[in-house]
Amino acid sequence: MINFEQWEGFEGRIWKEEVNVRDFIQKNYTPYDGDESFLAGPTEATDKLWGALQKLQKEERAKGGVLDMETEVVSSLTAYGPGYIDETLKDLEQIVGLQTDKPLKRAFMPYGGIKMAEQACTTYGYQPSEELHKIFTDYTRTHNQAVFDAYTPEMKAARHTHIITGLPDTYGRGRIVGDYRRVALYGIDALIRFKQEDFANCGDGTMTDDVIRLREEIARQISALKGMKKMAEAYGCDISQPAKNAKEACQWLYFGYLAAIKTQNGAAMSVGRISTFLDIYIQRDLENGTLTESQAQELIDHMVMKFRMVKFARIPSYNQLFSGDPVWATLEVGGIGMDGRSMVTKNCYRFLHTLENMGPAPEPNLTVLYSSALPENFKKYAAKVSINTSSVQYENDDVMKPVWGDDYSICCCVSATQTGKEMQFFGARANLAKCLLYAINGGVDEKSHEQCGPNYAPITSEYLNYDEVLPKYVQMLDWLAGLYVNVLNLIQYMHDKYYYEEAEMALIDTDVRRTFATGIAGFSHVIDSLSAIKYAKVKVVRDETGLATGYEVEGDFPKYGNDDDRADEIGVWLLRTFLEMIKKRHTYRNSEATTSILTITSNVVYGKYTGALPDGRAAFTPFAPGANPSYGAEQNGLLASLNSVAKLPYHWALDGISNTQTINPEALGHSEEERKENLVQVLDGYFDQGAHHLNVNVFGKEKLLDAMEHPEKEEYANFTIRVSGYAVKFIDLTREQQMDVISRTCHAAL
């Protein structure tokens, strides 16, 4: 058993004998069921630094979204010396460390693909280095090049037509959460020793492919840990030893995260479940008189300020999929332990309070792990912050805990992952609505008129017959699932080979659990289309070649989103059927196949490439996002809509079921107290049914319209809204995506 003087006052034994942060937390945290009255406002230092950062953000927006970009230096742990928000204010920064040498400057990260790194530069008027072009074209292979070299014609066609899209073949896959708490608890030197033990015990001497690969990966992880020490030394910090107080705990943890974002540009670079862990250090310092509540809040404010600054260089096609510059620095608060104790601490309040001290913001992606059993005071405070900022999402701790335990993190938008025990292979999503059109047209793409799917017999009748459509759809779905898994197997293999996440994996157990994440787009439109075919009459409109290009619906039909089992059960069937088709395939590194109903803002892109559907949706218009009902389908109010989504079993979509709802403030009540109580009741009722996720927006459409027309108004500079799985500054969305948000249902009544 190891022991450090920095651990004085901490209880427990197992976490001292092995890397086990959960055991440390369970033995040492202090649950809090009081209210928010203890919270402190922003310090003078916080106001000055946040003011300087807001000025930079304003300059960034004026320059078209990018303040500065690197063109000559390849990002790495030690590529840069120290950087600060403002050199003249650097002594005020309680938490230090930037991705590059300047605030909001975007790093050059070519290992995912040199073409992408260069295109990101030229898009914003920067000239990339000719020398780096030569190195990463002639001498070094990148992930992107390797993937496209290996793609089959069928894979390229599916990608081109957007029946599969958003694939991590032009950017880092992300969704891997290093257990950044380990840096604070153990220090780097101890973590290196643990990894060296793993290396010594890797294999039995027989050099199989798996053993060779794992030995190389562990060696790279050890190298990354050593690099983290050097990175921290540039800021005058020695992270070789455990953190001795709250400030060091916050700083050491942040250095672990900084290592990840300096070396990877994944679509989701989550922070993880850190609030209760850090509260242990803060509580110890408060009790021994070395920290005040104001200083504690300042630490959290400054840490969150750093998370708000994370930036990556992106290409236009990426921004169409994931609009508004998100990084998914997802950070969780709340939850209930396996022993039944609330895991709400004062620090959970402090993280939510950053939205009051520094105003609303999309990052970090603050996530409440919700249960109706959480302390009432905390539920009301979270509801209050939601109502005032629209910056918080909620996920059901009661359905996730049996699968992932009580120390999981959210690794992107809505996907759970065991912190420090697991990694996820991110896999974007398949267009199940377009797949229905392929079934009707025998694999011919309705937009390009080319044979992109298998040449099955098309449906030629004037009216669609449910008993004919369904088996053809199942057949086409099975083809799509098989192709989808093959594409992802190829991508994940190449990512491990050419863009391995050693800094993150160094902070995860060597014997790692792997999940294989897939996703569904167009979910509600498939439900309503099949319902229309089954319960109404759907006439096919064909072009001169006989291709189905439109549909006329005669009569009414039940729609998903109205608590009508006739429609909702189609959704349950669709989810289970697709998951079973995915799970029967071989997955890379024997990972566990999961799926999600989640689109991010790619619902707009998917819609652009998908023709008219039998539910009445017009050709090439946006899909409804995530698991949301189709636009205009919800006729019975918010609660009926929530009830429909809640029927989808989480255990068939362990990668997450995203639901985003907008509520007019008047629908929740006429006073702050009434609104808080009503929102808590909505959340309790929704999650007690087994629902997984809810984004909560509280505003009227009038505000959105005014923000779209007058983005220059000061009140809209940080106006944040929740979209499918994340938050975004509304004025950072494209006009098209703003219109899509405005077209969604805004519930005027519960």
Model-derived regions: residue spans:
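Conserved catalytic cores of very large enzyme subunits
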Residues: I2-L750
